[in-house]
């Protein structure tokens, strides 16, 4: 081969190799990027009305139906009202049944376990209550002296003196009666006249029963005003337990 043609041949092989693949350029169309699809925004879920709003709406609808049935009597108006009324009755029945079912699942919530509401158990329940009251009276009597401040000329105080007398006999309780006006009630012949005890103990309202701790020099009110014997026994229990609720 002519040495003069060799460089020319090399150039023919080199230039096509360094260029782009022109043979496919007619097919390589410019691809436009796809536009981002706008997906529809899902509709917000429908919110249920607040329970208080729902209750108020039902109550208003029931009242309105009742008033319409009264002011504009007719079959349609009455049926509209009565259907709403039956709805309330049905819901009340479901509530009652769910409560009974709940008491079986959670007996600790059943009030009937502590205080039976059946008439047949009243006698036993009263006996248990009275036993607690007796224990409370005995407990307080061990730590406190019991003083009864009264006015001998007041008829209500005189009526309470009868209760105090009966209470002392029933429970064997020692009570010190004190007349603040100097008039001794004949039902309480062991009464003392007030020599400043009421003022020292801070008793300003009468009649009054006070618990006095001679060791500590403290005083606790037990009752003011007239009170029956049964309620006085309950009051001893309440004071001894610092008025702890029994429900």
From Swiss-Prot:
Transmembrane segments: none annotated. It is found in: Periplasm. It comes from the Bacteria. Pfam families: TraF (PF13728). Keywords: Conjugation, Periplasm, Plasmid, Signal. The keyword 4Fe-4S does not apply. Residues 1-19 form the signal peptide. One of its GO terms (cellular component) is periplasmic space. NCBIfam families: PRK13703.1, TraF. Involved in F pilus assembly. This is Protein TraF. The lineage of its organism: Bacteria, Pseudomonadati, Pseudomonadota, Gammaproteobacteria, Enterobacterales.
């Amino acid at each position: 081969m002519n040495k003069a043609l060799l460089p020319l041949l090399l150039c023919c092989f080199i230039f096509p190799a360094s260029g782009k693949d022109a043979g496919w350029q007619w097919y390589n169309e410019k691809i436009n990027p796809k536009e981002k699809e706008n997906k529809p925004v899902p509709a917000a879920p429908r919110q249920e009305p607040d329970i208080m709003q729902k209750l108020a709406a039902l109550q208003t609808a029931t009242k309105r139906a009742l008033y319409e049935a009264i002011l504009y009597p007719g079959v349609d108006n009455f049926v509209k009202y009565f259907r709403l009324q039956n709805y309330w009755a049905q819901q009340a029945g479901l509530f009652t049944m769910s409560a009974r079912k709940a008491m079986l699942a959670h007996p600790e919530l059943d009030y009937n376990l502590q205080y039976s509401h059946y008439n047949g158990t009243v006698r036993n329940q009263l006996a248990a209550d009275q036993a607690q009251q007796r224990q409370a009276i005995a407990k307080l009597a061990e730590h406190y002296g019991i003083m009864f401040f009264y006015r001998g000329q007041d008829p209500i105080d005189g009526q309470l003196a009868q209760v105090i007398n009966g209470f002392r006999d029933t429970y064997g309780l020692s009570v010190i009666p004190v007349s603040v006006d100097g008039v001794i009630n004949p039902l309480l012949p062991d009464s003392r006249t007030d020599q400043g005890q009421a003022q020292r103990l801070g008793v300003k309202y009468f009649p009054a029963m006070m618990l006095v701790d001679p060791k500590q020099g403290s005083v606790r009110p037990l009752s003011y005003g007239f009170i029956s014997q049964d309620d006085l026994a309950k009051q001893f229990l309440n004071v001894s337990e610092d008025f702890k609720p029994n429900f």
